[in-house]
Swiss-Prot record:
Organism per entry: Camponotus floridanus
Family named by the database record: Belongs to the peptidase M67A family. BRCC36 subfamily.
Presence of the UniProt keyword Protein biosynthesis in the record: no
Protein name, as recorded: Lys-63-specific deubiquitinase BRCC36
Annotated cofactor note: Binds 1 zinc ion per subunit.
């Protein structure tokens, strides 16, 4: 591990896309995940992400269990072997639906706790579902911070372009709907066999509505996006095949 202090964070665009998709999956609760990458010369380079299942849905806070941290560490070890470079958990992210991008006192305390284990650990906050006062349009803000003597300190952040979406980010994107469905199933299980018939009907209706919501905002758009990418890749393949044939004719001619 590099002992230098954190000076800058580089976030790959495919990781940014996954985090943002997760943040936009619900405007009623905060969501969270863990960031994986490598750290060297004061720069944290984030190239993978793990979406965490919410153990308890709360509007104003999120929590990471020790089991989830262990799972993330195991995934980092797996990526170390797969990519043949050192990978580890570099930080966490969570959403602020309808509220400021600034870290709350709880966020700062949580961040300080993580930094006691790793001084270079960083936090990202995605402020979503906010409306501009003048434009009245949907705005998204991103804050990168650490805790310093009980106060939030902003860390320079650069979003680094990646020409393609990595396989690991694609897997994470497709896992999102599964995780959200599992959260709803866990909540439904807790309310199962309610003695009040009307309450039971209401709970089932809420569950059905939640599952439809997941399909509409996550699964269906993701399928449509992948279908468009497949069509585009086919066009590119056809174009490259034609170029290859022309070059072969020139060489043979």
């Amino acid at each position: 591990m590099d002992d230098s202090s954190l000076q800058k964070v580089e976030l790959q665009t495919d990781v940014y896309m996954v985090c943002l998709q997760h943040a936009l999956s619900t405007e009623n609760f905060e969501v969270m995940g863990l960031l994986i990458g490598n750290f060297a010369c004061g720069i944290a380079k984030i190239s993978a992400v793990i979406i965490l299942r919410r153990l308890d849905k709360k509007k104003d806070r999120v929590e990471i269990s020790s089991e989830q941290l262990l799972k993330a560490a195991a995934e980092a070890e797996r990526l170390t072997v797969e990519l043949n470079r050192p990978m580890r958990v570099l930080g966490w992210y969570h959403s602020h639906p309808h509220i400021t991008v600034c870290p709350s006192h709880v966020d700062v305390r949580t961040q300080a706790t993580y930094q006691t284990m790793d001084h270079s650990f960083v936090g990202l906050i995605f402020s979503v579902f906010s409306e501009g006062k003048e434009s009245k349009e949907h705005e998204i803000f991103l804050n990168c911070f650490q805790s310093d003597n009980g106060e939030a300190t902003e860390i320079p952040l650069e979003i680094v372009h990646t020409p393609d979406i990595s396989d690991r980010c694609l897997r994470t994107m497709t896992d999102l709907s599964k995780i959200l469905v599992q959260e709803e199933e866990d909540m439904a299980e807790a309310c199962k066999d309610h003695p009040d018939v009307l309450a039971s009907i209401h709970n089932n209706a809420v569950r059905t509505r939640a599952l439809i919501h997941i399909t509409d905002i996550i699964t269906k758009p993701l399928v449509q996006t992948f279908e468009k990418r497949i069509a585009l890749n086919k066009l590119r393949a056809t174009h490259l095949q034609r170029q290859l044939q022309e070059l072969q004719k020139m060489c043979n001619g």
